[in-house]
Amino acid sequence: MHKSNLQFDGGHHTISRGLRAGIGKRTTGTRYVTIKSRLVVAVFFLLLTAAFRVTPCLAQQDWIKTGTGLGMEKVRLAVPDFKPSTSDAKNADLLKVFNDTLWNDLENAGIFDMASKSFYPLAIPGTPTEVQFSAWNGPPPNASMLVFGNLGVTGNNVTVQGWLYDVKNLTSPQVLGKQYQDTATPAAARTIAHKFANEIIFRLGGGIPGIAESQIYFVSSRSGHKEIWVMDYDGANQRQITHLGSISLSPRISPDGSRLAFSSVTKSGWDILMYSMDLNRLVSFPKYGGTNLSPAWSPDGTRLAFSSSRSGDPEIYVVDQSGGNIKRITSFKGPDVSPVWNRKTGAQIAWVSGRSGLPQIYTMEADGTNVQRVTDQGYAVSPAWSPNGQFLVFAWTRHYGPGAPGASDIYLMDAASKQWVQLTHDGGRNDFPSWSPDGRHIVFQSSRAGGEQIWSMLADGSNQKQLTSTGGNTQPNWSWK
């Protein structure tokens, strides 16, 4: 028998006891309303809306998997359902929520080889003394790691005990042991599963925190207006944030999760608005005149870049977190839109410019110097920088023009070498990619199934899943953590 060490988590507190762009480029059926900027918006709309296609090109490549942390050998993981530890009537419902959520979180991580439950032995362990190593480390499961535990309801509280065992290590198998306590609700069971999954991913995924508790902000028209919504990373718990009855686009959550910047039509035209997630309401933010679109936070949360036509052509400006100290950092004929910061260094900004004709991706230092063109042809929009600063992902129609085949697809490019690979090949318009905090996943919008919906995939283009289905849903933005 092996000594079991547990960490006890109660609600949101942990006690150790010995034991982790952009402008609305296409808004079909939407009427833009401005006072003095109708022409500028028309230019933006013309620049960033058309239906097109592209031919498939490069396949998945090893340098992508390595750079995104997907290149490591996958750990063979067995995750049997947790067992009930009490006979309370709520046990069955909470166990189902917990077990389904834990499995999905670990499967979605992209770094595990999940052993099929059909291979599991009949004797499922709920505690360490019940583990039969030979039943798990040999055929048919052939697992390297085993996740197991129990859940029990007592009164209004639920307690979950969970372990991660290296079943190849017979002398010291325990990698992780945790105990969680919270109110006995399905939401709490789901939260506990997310927390435990993140712990497992952190331990087995190279010390990179999991994304099971992260959120995705997006635009939805399901209420009759384009409002800002938020959902869990897997598409669950979709809920409305704004109720402005207008057109709101380009939601961008701050790195600390306390503020949400977005573009919206107001009485004065297109403005940048700021929403406090702590106060659950809009807070004061300056108006700059002209058309103001596509806000983007710096990695430290102290600055905001956005596109504004306040001086004529749409240009990129930077302000502090309160909207003051405005500074223009681009100056060239033609629209400059959709800025995004290098998320690792904060020293560079990628953006979309029409200075060469059709929109292309460019990079520059955060002060506007050292401008470099990234894409060399076609129609490229919606850049997003990976958390490690190595990759840019964007929407690209490489062969654009009359008679050109295909639609807009998501591409990934190494920012230094300019090597690129196509991630989507499924027709329709694929646009507005955004990186997960761990750099292993990308969320994007796609019209492949008809209307615009939000999808996610691993950063190598595999495991594509639809997250939304009600109404039109666009412009996703993954939280920073």
Place the predicted regions along the sequence by residue:
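Residue-level detector of Asp-centered blade-edge/turn motifs that repeat once per structural unit
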Residues: 211-212, 255-256, 299-300, 343-345, ...
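Bacterial N-terminal signal peptides
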Residues: 40-53
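Amphipathic beta-strand/beta-sheet edge segments enriched in Tyr/Trp
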Residues: 62, 127-199
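A flexible loop/linker signature enriched in serine peptidases of the S9 family
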Residues: 220-227, 243-246, 263-272, 286-291, ...
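Short loop/turn segments that connect beta-strands within beta-propeller blades
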Residues: 232-236, 276-280, 320-324, 365-369, ...
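Short beta-strand->alpha-helix linker/helix-N-cap micro-motif
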Residues: 66-133, 150-151
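Hydrophobic beta-strand positions that form the internal "hydrophobic ladder"
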Residues: 216, 260, 301-305, 349, ...
